[in-house]
Design a protein with these regions (language model features):
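ASCE P-loop NTPase motor core, strongest for the SF2 helicase catalytic module
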Residues: 3-174, 181
Length: 183
């Protein structure tokens, strides 16, 4: 359901990715687990048909698809797995026009600022970012901070600010609650 709404928003907002309109996005990169690449492609076809926008899905090696996306205005959307992103990021950073929007499905995979995958997005330098996840907090609040910082860099200035304002009070309240239960 959310993917349908997202695709609808992309098309309405970007007027079929028209490069002549101010504030539109010419190229979109969708990064997801490899098992979801075909599903994303199917959803685009289901809701937009085959000819409304150019969609490429990387299911195998992907070199040809990445080159087509990077060097052609014919394709506006590239769907690829997280693993393929790491091997393609340098080529993707040279896309003409540049990638204007990145969508990360199962975005909780970006749980640390120091992972190779998370650092790939720094190379792309895309300002517009959407992160989709059903589990934003898996282990600790630092992972949540990383995801928020990915979508809105600098919102909390630094992790130390986030920790002082949010994480520490939450952890203290949890500790107090636990001690009351165990008395």
């Amino acid at each position: 359901m959310y993917k349908r709404q997202l695709i609808s928003i992309l098309i309405q907002q970007n007027c079929y990715f028209s490069p002549l309109r101010t504030g539109t996005v010419d190229k979109v990169l969708i990064v997801c687990p490899l098992t979801l690449v075909v599903n994303w492609k199917r959803e685009f076809r289901k809701w937009l048909g085959r000819n409304s926008i150019g969609v490429l899905a990387v299911e195998g090696d992907g070199r040809i698809e990445v080159e087509q996306f990077v060097n052609s205005r014919q394709y506006q959307v590239l769907i690829l797995g997280y693993e393929r992103l790491r091997s393609s990021v340098q080529r993707l950073s040279r896309a003409i026009p540049a990638i204007g929007l990145v969508i990360c499905d199962e975005g909780h995979r970006l749980k640390s600022r120091d992972t190779k995958t998370t650092r790939c997005f720094d190379i792309l330098q895309t300002r517009r970012r959407i992160l989709l996840t059903g589990t934003p907090i898996q282990n600790d609040l630092r992972e949540f901070y990383t995801m928020v910082d990915f979508v809105y860099p600098g919102l909390f200035d630094q992790y130390s600010v986030f920790k002082r304002v949010f994480e520490d009070p939450i952890m203290r309240s949890r500790a107090q609650h636990l001690s009351l239960i165990h008395i």
